[in-house]
Amino acid sequence: METPPIVIDNGSYEIKFGPSTNKKPFRALNALAKDKFGTSYLSNHIKNIKDISSITFRRPHELGQLTLWELESCIWDYCLFNPSEFDGFDLKEGKGHHLVASESCMTLPELSKHADQVIFEEYEFDSLFKSPVAVFVPFTKSYKGEMRTISGKDEDIDIVRGNSDSTNSTSSESKNAQDSGSDYHDFQLVIDSGFNCTWIIPVLKGIPYYKAVKKLDIGGRFLTGLLKETLSFRHYNMMDETILVNNIKEQCLFVSPVSYFDSFKTKDKHALEYVLPDFQTSFLGYVRNPRKENVPLPEDAQIITLTDELFTIPETFFHPEISQITKPGIVEAILESLSMLPEIVRPLMVGNIVCTGGNFNLPNFAQRLAAELQRQLPTDWTCHVSVPEGDCALFGWEVMSQFAKTDSYRKARVTREEYYEHGPDWCTKHRFGYQNWI
């Protein structure tokens, strides 16, 4: 009997990996860090750093492209051959194992070819299927997790939220697709907002419509950098405190539920106090509980009060001009992508938007996106945005593991025999590349 495929969501910030039969993936940071004393820390060992100031990072991905396999191979070895840290998971050797992996959309052909060579020749996997995460998202008919579908029209919100059957979309097309013989949804607009950037990818019949793919150069890395500059200007110099600021971003930031101006009027109500680390009782700091304001803090405690920073930083998704970026926001990018699709499928795509990526863990992001997009659409169109109820960063791996159980996967994968027979150029051009679809 064939062994279950190994699924690797090779994100630029974090790798999610594990057998497709697992309910949840293992997680490992996709980076190498060096502290101010010159000590290097690989992947999850970064979490053991006590003095987090002046940490420098080196990542295998540059501008969203996997360019440094010398480092990525070390991180993969740490993930695949380290049973002591990952609950006994050990690949032992690649032979007899199959791989389902993600790669960045629009990966350069030479870089994609290099990845094939490493996977087949160094790790010796028996077969490979790789694709952008957006390609796996339509294969969610048997997805066991909970999805929350948000309507752009106010009168539909309660109905859609209360409908437990609307797991992935609510349009009539999607319901018909669920009853059809295919193992995927025919029309979906996938928004993948990750560490490096945000991709808008229309998927028709399980294949990305590359002519309409759009990229927004705002992601988790950008938000962390902008927050560092803002806090350094208003409070303390935090330009070398990447780990601390990233933690503040993940714990505190949110997207304005209605509009930036409404949140700005009530910014004092949303204000939070963040206690900076003293490296004795805390190494990352923490948000001060407003219910425990009477509890005395240590005498040397340093506190920063966060007011409009909480929602101004994520607002750059909708208004990049806030950070002096003269490019369209996420709503304009979606509209531009829709304009490049065949006119007949545009309402179907709008009614079947699926969000994935760690940035959608920001509270109110999906709701605000649905509301802002609905205002720009024709009145007879209804925008439906689906977002996972759990950790959005894990949704990519979960749909990949669902895809690994379908007949489509077994038909589309490339075996090691095919790779050695046809060569890496054939794999890139005819199976894993995007050139033939443009």
Swiss-Prot record:
GO terms for cellular component: chromatin; cytoplasm; nuclear periphery; Swr1 complex. This is Actin-like protein ARP6. Residues 158-181 are annotated as: Disordered. Belongs to the actin family. ARP6 subfamily. It is found in: Cytoplasm; Nucleus. SMART domains: ACTIN. One of its GO terms (biological process) is regulation of DNA-templated transcription. Gene3D superfamilies: 3.30.420.40, Actin, Chain A, domain 4. Component of the SWR1 chromatin remodeling complex composed of at least ACT1, ARP4, RVB1, RVB2, ARP6, YAF9, VPS71, VPS72, SWC3, SWC4, SWC5, SWC7 and SWR1, and perhaps BDF1. Component of the SWR1 complex which mediates the ATP-dependent exchange of histone H2A for the H2A variant HZT1 leading to transcriptional regulation of selected genes by chromatin remodeling. Involved in chromosome stability. Pfam families: Actin. Present with 238 molecules/cell in log phase SD medium. It comes from Saccharomyces cerevisiae (strain ATCC 204508 / S288c). Transmembrane segments: none annotated. InterPro entries: Actin, ATPase_NBD. GO terms for molecular function: nucleosome binding. Keywords: Activator, Chromatin regulator, Cytoplasm, Nucleus, Transcription, Transcription regulation. Residues 163-174 have a biased composition (Low complexity).
